[in-house]
Swiss-Prot record:
It catalyses: L-seryl-[protein] + ATP = O-phospho-L-seryl-[protein] + ADP + H(+); L-threonyl-[protein] + ATP = O-phospho-L-threonyl-[protein] + ADP + H(+). GO terms for molecular function: ATP binding; protein serine kinase activity; protein serine/threonine kinase activity. Residues 35-286 form the Protein kinase domain. One of its GO terms (cellular component) is cytoplasm. Residues 446-493 form the SARAH domain. It comes from Caenorhabditis elegans. Residues 390-416 have a biased composition (Polar residues). This is Serine/threonine-protein kinase cst-1. SMART domains: S_TKc. Belongs to the protein kinase superfamily. STE Ser/Thr protein kinase family. STE20 subfamily.
Length: 497
């Protein structure tokens, strides 16, 4: 179901004023004949971001080069979502190219970089007025996405970009964000959970209100330079966020009552009690936000500081993506309700080219791209279209949102005796238990836990906290051991200069 008439009118009024467009002839050419790459803006686990010039028009663009060794179906789906977003508060997507084993994603160039870049260049957080101006634009972007029943799921300062006019735009919510997550998992890099809403961590199902929590955390990040819990181990933060009271400013008295109230409105543990982006736009703190002039002054100050410090102002590389559970795309498309299911229709691989054309993707599909259902004998796979969810024949993949339960999955209809046959009846020693548990982590088979008494399970659960604390202390000791010699040599070299 499309957005309401009021929403449609508002979206039209706030549509991107950028008239640049890649025509069909440009999409049918090799990308190096269409663009001149003039410099690298950043690099992350997903690949690299480059500043580029469109040869014919001279238009400045950003191009993300992403290695394509992931599910092509997911790429098609996410590009479809990106193409639908037409708001001046969301980074615009122009088209994509397959080039060898990479996907080149052509997007709007935001010359002032991200809010994280601004803070790094100035070496200080934002002022309260600057924060309110950033939040105003960000809320308009979120309101637009939420009207379309889409969830960003990665709101943070590094994913809010600024153009030179001082307009804040949401970024890294489409295919690049999805591929960032995929590449991070492949490289065993664990993302940071500090911006994640409690319901996302607990996997109890969530909707657009998860973005509102992340926005509240981002507001604190802009005010204090880092999000709450960032001084502790990420794995410990995962336990603390759902169980502790909502975070607040370290020194609430330093901020206005309106700003404190805005934070409280965002950081409510129960998502149903959080305000929507539309309602937050009416908050006093947002309605009193200054115009773009203050943003332009902030950008100018950051650029001057960057020149003095020889730190280039560039689009954020986005290599600190929020921890996401496996199998989750960065944005979720949907229909009428907020928690949405997708249409159950299929297309064959033969129609993939027509999909690519409609989504403005040029070039040949790389051999490294994975197409679900393909086989080594060359049989045509069945490719699911953008926004598709698995059919009833595969109920395990039929939910677009995180679902209940984070523990082991036991097959239904299996008798108690079969569990005993499949695992040890007793864990006689600590060594035996640890060995069995380590194997279970690798194999994903935790059935042996069913044969341990309830009291023993509770005891072992309680011991995990102390074990985690010890592991964190050991990690810190190893970090300091490696870091100190480097600091010592740096100090010696400084003295010799």
């Amino acid at each position: 179901m499309p957005p309401s008439t009021d929403s449609s009118r508002r979206n039209s009024e706030e549509g991107s004023s950028d008239g640049f467009k890649l025509d069909s002839s440009a999409l049918n050419k090799p990308p190096e004949e269409v663009f001149d790459i003039v410099g690298k803006l950043g690099e992350g686990s997903y690949g690299s971001v480059h500043k580029a010039i469109h040869r014919e028009s001279g238009h400045v663009l950003a191009i993300k080069k992403v290695p394509v060794d992931t599910d092509l179906q997911e790429i098609i789906k996410e590009i479809s979502i990106m193409q639908q977003c037409k708001s001046k508060y969301v980074v615009k997507y122009y088209g994509s190219y397959f080039k060898h084993s990479d996907l080149w994603i052509v997007m709007e160039y935001c010359g002032a970089g991200s809010i994280s870049d601004i803070m790094r260049a100035r070496r200080k957080p934002l002022s309260e007025q600057e924060i309110s101006a950033v939040l105003r634009d960000t809320l308009k972007g979120l309101q637009y996405l939420h009207d379309l029943k889409k969830i960003h799921r990665d709101i943070k300062a590094g994913n809010i970009l600024l153009n030179t006019d001082g307009i804040a735009k949401l970024a890294d919510f489409g295919v690049a964000g999805q591929l960032t997550d995929t590449m991070a998992k492949r490289n065993t890099v664990i993302g940071t959970p500090f911006w994640m809403a409690p319901e996302v961590i607990e996997e109890i199902g969530y909707d657009t209100k998860a973005d509102i929590w992340s926005l509240g955390i981002t507001a604190i990040e802009m005010a204090e330079g880092r999000p709450p819990y960032s001084d502790i181990h990420p794995m410990r933060a995962i336990f603390m966020i759902p169980t502790k009271p909502p975070p607040t400013f370290k020194k609430p008295e330093e901020w206005s009552s309106e700003f404190n109230d805005f934070i409280r409105s965002c950081l409510i543990k129960k998502p149903e009690e959080r305000k929507t982006a539309l309602r937050l736009c009416e908050h006093t703190f947002i309605k009193n936000a200054p115009g773009c002039d203050i943003m332009q002054l902030m950008i100018q100050d950051a650029q001057e500081k960057a020149i003095l410090g020889q730190a280039p102002m560039a689009a954020s590389s986005g290599n600190d993506a929020t921890l996401l559970s496996e199998g989750m795309s960065t944005m979720i498309d949907g229909g009428e309700s907020t928690l949405v299911q997708h249409k159950d229709n299929y297309v064959t691989a033969q129609s993939l080219r027509s999909q690519m054309e409609s989504l403005r993707i040029g070039g040949e599909i790389p051999k490294s791209a994975y197409i679900p259902g393909s086989s080594k004998n060359g049989n045509s796979p069945r490719v699911q279209p953008p926004g598709h969810t698995a059919s009833a024949s595969d109920p395990s993949k039929n939910q677009p949102f995180a679902q209940d339960g984070t523990g082991p999955n036991f097959q239904l209809g299996t008798s108690e005796s079969s569990y005993k046959d499949a695992s040890y009846n007793m864990m006689n020693t600590e060594a035996e238990y640890e060995n069995r548990f380590q194997r279970a982590v690798v194999d994903g088979d935790f059935e042996f836990l069913r044969n341990i008494t309830l009291d023993e399970l509770i005891r072992r659960k309680e011991s995990l906290d102390s074990e985690m604390e010890e592991e964190i202390r050991e990690l810190q000791r190893r970090y300091k051991t490696k870091r100190q010699p480097i600091l010592d040599v740096i100090e010696i070299k400084k003295r010799l200069q």
